[in-house]
Amino acid sequence: MPLPRQVAEDVNDARQRAAKRTKIIDILRRCRPMEPWPGHRQSGQSIPQDDSGVKGIASRLILTLHTNQAPNRFASIPVLWGILSWMRPHSSRLYNKDLAPTNPEQRTWGTYNFAALWVSMAHCIPTYMLASGLIGAGMSWGQALGTILLGNTIVLVPILLNSHAGTKHGIPFPVFARAAYGTFGSNVPALMRALVACGWFGIQAWIGGQALHVFFRSVWPGWAAAIPGSFGGHTATEWISFLLFWGLNVIVIYRGMDLLRKVENWAAPFVLVMTALLVWWALDRANGLGPILAQKGKFGSWREFWPVFVPSLTAMIGFWATLSLNMPDFTRFGRSQREQAIGQIVALPTTMTVFATMGVIITSASAIIYGKAIWDPVELVGKFTEPVIVAISMFTVVVATLSVNIAANVVSPANDFANAFPRLITFSRGGLLTGFIGIALQPWKLLADPSGYIFDWLLGYSGGLGSIAGVLIADYWILRRSELVVEDLYREEGIYERWRWTGIAATLLGCSAAWIGLVVPLLRPLYDYAWFVGFAVSFSTYLIFSSPLSVKKPSTATIYHS
């Protein structure tokens, strides 16, 4: 009995598709198994085409199948990418699994996670001591807290602008920078930012080690003298505590981002509660807020206040200037733009200001209780006579410092090093390298001056990071209108140059303008405005050097899917 015409046509179509499948399988059997393209699960991306050799033949066959207008096409895009995953259309010099775009299963961070991230990062000893450095420079407590609030509100703008790329495209900061600096040129801003983060890692690790040392001393009174000898002005047990805390950081690094998210979820509220209890203790023991809240600033006029306010404000921006660049490292795990934006807007300025206020209150009370203002909370708690209180307080400091150190000072440089040397360095190895560099920078010397890290450390590097932020924002929002071809960010011969010299030149000009005041006394005011100067110069010069016509467009042969 003859088959109906439509059935016969369907059978014939099925036979043709089966023959095409056989050809593809034969080709794939001759291909060396390779890692899948990093964006194969991402929606809205295009299929890269490679016309060379076996890969090109297979790619063209698959594209032919996909564009077939028959009612029952060969397969969906995910199936096609399952086949293409044997071909590696990306470059091994630009890709490893830690740099790959996140897939939907990895996007688990919501509003609370981003808010908790900032709360936990803000609750650290350097934040606690920010107001002390500003008050020491002559500000009143109100002026100091106002400067902190304003600085964190300003830096929130570039943070949100750069965060957008992480959530939209699922890419980390080093890959995001490839659009503006080139696929290999992106190593320049990535390594600049990484070195700053390494310095911060060392600072936080030393503070955490000191807290751990006091904790051990509270539970074991003979701890300080348990091991004789000293080095560099510090006892052997201090060095052991430092290395133990450093090791805790390494453990979290090797456990990955999911462990970080879990730690942040409970560490953030725990730190808030413990700090509030410390405020209650201080007010109860001092019978009042103390002399610092009552004293006025040393500046009698705006003319006297301005020369201190400007570099102080710039330093406050510099405090989180590192995160203004690499927030895509975190927002790539976000479920939506709305959730990541709300979490950051709510948490950053308020938490920084509230925690700094707590530091002012506690320190003010210490002036009454102990006869002098003690700005270092580790030193303050070390004076307590109740071992239980000391142990709980130091445990809080250790948890807070560990949380902020991993989130703020390990994630980005680890990705940066992996971006520069993807064949050799994974995220875990990059984190370990960050730890070693942090030790080599000798953080115990950086912390020798209690206010030096504000006017030397923060102010100094802010000019360089502001210059990078200017280029990234100009490229992503003005030239490219937030559109990126993600797969080409992982290819050497894609639409993005290997070295985009306009981005590098604009960054160097921004750095030069921001730092020239260090060598030319007449131009010292430029250094006081370092972040603003670096950002403005790099932003404007990048747009002058570039034009919309210089931005390569995706190939018309590219296929987009939903």
Located regions from the model:
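Transmembrane alpha-helical segments of multi-pass small-molecule transport proteins
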Residues: A190, R217-Y254, P269-L278, S312-M327, ...
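Selective recognition of specific alpha-helical transmembrane segments in multi-pass small-molecule
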Residues: C124-P126, L150-P158, M192-Q204, A268-D284, ...
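Membrane-interface loop-to-helix entry segments
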Residues: M192, I203, G209, I240-D284, ...
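C-terminal membrane-solvent junction of multi-pass transporters and transport-like membrane proteins
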Residues: P101, S428-G430, I468-T541, P548, ...
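Transmembrane helix-boundary motif of multi-pass solute transporters/channels
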Residues: S91-Y181, G185-V188, T322-P349, S364-A373
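Hydrophobic alpha-helical segments and their helix-loop junctions in multi-pass secondary transporters
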Residues: A205, G209-S218, F270-G297, F319, ...
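Membrane-interface "cap" regions at the ends of multi-pass membrane proteins
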Residues: A58-L61, L65-N68, N72-W141, L156, ...
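Hydrophobic, membrane-embedded alpha-helices of multi-pass small-molecule transporters
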Residues: W109-Y128, S241-L248, V279-A286, G297-I362, ...
